[in-house]
């Protein structure tokens, strides 16, 4: 005789078995999918973590939508700026001005490598030669032969040095050269490898570049006098030449020179661990203050800084 009270147990048992098998299938499917994701090219830890966290909650469809793009899907990088072919650009600019004399010298102050372009024979140096006069006077101060506090003209020598460099005073220049003595100035220049006659005031762009390089590397003067002279070569009364054409982030110390068709700028340019003496000497039939001459010097400067500093 059977017990009617036990019959309902059979269907319940079958349902439990079905549920167990369904759960097993779901777990197996999860394992398969996780294995595929882990071995798929381009999958990353973010995707695996997301799938492990969300798959068993039934949010499988969101995985593909929330997966971060792999490297192949990243936005393309901006193309690098083309390198400046400096010799070609210098020749292009110089060749476009056949009625001008143009000489450019570039000296790397770290390794002494010198590059020159155009006509680098001596030019009337105009006021760029005032840097040589200043260096000679500071040298005499360091040897004890001169004093910055000594009267010179209506002021003292220190005042005249600053006026000569920072505001390009010709009166101060004459006072300082006479106090040094023209033969002594010539002799001092010779110790630096520069042939210089104050009466003629002729200097080659390459010699001016060497002078600036020796100044900035501390080979001419002591640290205090070097810093003082370089300080006078910033924020001068004419910043329209090289300083007006350099990019932000490039430090400029310079001495310009303008006289009778000659327009020059002798500069030290530095950024980071790079430093160059850059000298641009020009002569032309046009007015020295003409827009064309400014454009010429600015164009040269843009190409130079683009090649030297990438900006």
PLM features: residue spans?
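Conserved catalytic neighborhood of penicillin-recognizing serine enzymes
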Residues: 145-186, 193-195
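N-terminal Sec/ER secretory leader and immediately downstream segment
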Residues: 103-108, 114-116, 125-127
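Penicillin-recognizing serine hydrolase domain
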Residues: 2-5, 14-69, 81-102, 107-109, ...
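Active-site SXXK
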Residues: 112, 122-152, 164, 278
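A glycine-rich, coil/turn loop motif that links secondary-structure elements
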Residues: 119-124, 153-154, 197-205
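Acidic/histidine-rich, surface-exposed loop or edge segments in extracytoplasmic proteins
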Residues: 59-77, 110-118, 166
């Amino acid at each position: 005789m059977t017990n009617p009270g036990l019959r309902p147990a059979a269907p319940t048992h079958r349902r439990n078995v079905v549920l167990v098998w369904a759960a097993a299938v779901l777990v197996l499917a999860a394992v398969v999918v996780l294995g595929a994701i882990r071995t798929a090219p381009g999958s990353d830890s973010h995707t695996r973590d997301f799938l492990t966290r969300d798959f068993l909650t039934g949010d499988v469809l969101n995985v593909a939508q929330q997966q971060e793009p792999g490297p192949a899907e990243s936005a393309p990088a901006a193309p690098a700026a083309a390198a400046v072919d400096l010799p070609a650009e210098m020749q292009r600019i110089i060749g476009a001005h056949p009625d001008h004399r143009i000489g450019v010298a570039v000296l790397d102050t770290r390794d002494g490598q010198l590059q020159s372009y155009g006509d680098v024979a001596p030019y009337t140096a105009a006021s760029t030669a005032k840097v040589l006069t200043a260096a000679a006077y500071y040298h005499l101060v360091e040897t004890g032969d001169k004093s910055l506090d000594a009267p010179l003209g209506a002021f003292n020598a220190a005042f005249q040095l600053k006026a000569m460099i920072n505001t390009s005073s010709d009166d101060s220049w004459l006072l300082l050269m006479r106090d040094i003595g023209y033969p002594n100035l010539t002799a001092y220049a010779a110790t630096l490898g520069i042939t210089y006659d104050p009466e003629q005031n002729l200097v080659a762009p390459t010699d001016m570049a060497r002078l600036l390089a020796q100044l900035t590397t501390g080979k001419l003067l002591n640290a205090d006098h070097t810093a003082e002279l370089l300080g006078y070569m910033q924020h001068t009364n004419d910043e329209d030449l090289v300083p007006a054409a350099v990019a932000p982030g490039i430090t400029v110390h310079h001495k310009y020179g303008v006289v009778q068709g000659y327009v020059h700028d002798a500069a030290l340019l530095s950024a980071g661990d790079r430093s160059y003496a850059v000298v641009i000497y020009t002569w032309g039939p046009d007015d020295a203050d003409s827009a064309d001459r400014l454009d010429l010097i600015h164009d040269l400067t843009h190409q130079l800084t683009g090649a030297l500093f990438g900006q």
